[in-house]
Every structure is written in structure tokens, then in C-alpha cells.
Amino acid sequence: MDKVELEFYFFMKGQAGSFTTNLFKTIMSADFGNQYKLSFGFPDEVSVVQKYKNEDGYWENLLNKFDNPESV
């Protein structure tokens, strides 16, 4: 699991810091055009949110990687 995925995990669990929380909330609420603009400064964070929104099973796989690291 990379650093951004770990930050996203903590965000989703309500345990992220204020900057990370506000960043992910902003990315998640942005339309495609604004996500594109945000990706210039935060490419990995935007990528994780897009995977979460568009890839079936992404969140479940992320949970599995965090909760069962030996199984990955």
C-alpha cells in the first residue's frame, strides 16, 4: 500500500488530519474538469479518488491490503 492509499484509508475511516480530510472532500466533490485541475498539484490523491469512484472492488481491495497485509 502506498502513502496516498494509506492517507485515503484514514480519511475514509474519519481519522485523517484536517488538510488531508479537506483535500479528499474537495476532490470527491469536484466535477471532472476540476479534478483535472486538482491533479496538477495532487496527482496521486486524484487518482485514488477516481479509482474509488470508478473501479469495482477498489475499496474492498484497499481494505484487504490494510487489514491483511500478509495476504497481499
Describe each region flagged by the PLM.
Residues M1-A30:
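N-terminal acidic leader/helix
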Residues F10, I27, F42, F66-D67:
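Generic low-complexity, intrinsically disordered sequence content enriched
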Residues G57-V72:
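Long acidic/polar interaction regions in large eukaryotic complex-forming proteins
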Residues M28-E60:
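Short, charge-rich amphipathic interface segments used for partner binding and complex assembly
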